[in-house]
Amino acid sequence: MKFVLAGLAAALLVIGNAEAASLDMAAAEAMMKKDGCAACHAVDKKIIGPSYQEVAAKYKGDKEAPAKLAKKVKEGGSGVWGQIPMPPNATTSDADVKALVDWILTLKK
């Protein structure tokens, strides 16, 4: 029984890590350029908007973070990181938004 539970736990870890790693750095950077994110955001420094590392740190442990951030990417908004509003990205596919948000949330400072 212990071996079954250990195997199940290992499988869940692999599945979870594979999902989080579904977007690598090169793919994320290409997506950021294609969708215009790189004009305001960088991985490790503030440009106009916060760095993705800052976003990941702010939302660490928040189970609602993926949904909150996906909504913010799609609809835009202001007041969370300063006065300059983030424009909406309504034409970016839901799959691309999810992949990018999931990747951002894996980053560490």
Region annotations inferred by a language model:
Residues 6-15:
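Bacterial N-terminal signal peptides
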Residues 15-21:
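Sec/Tat signal peptide C-region and signal peptidase I cleavage site
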Residues 24, 28, 65, 69, ...:
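Stable alpha-helical elements in mature extracytoplasmic
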Residues 24-43:
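Sequence/structural segment immediately N-terminal to covalent heme-attachment motifs in c-type
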Residues 39, 45-59, 71-101:
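Axial heme c-ligation environment in periplasmic c-type cytochrome domains
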Residues 108-109:
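Short, solvent-exposed mixed-charge patches
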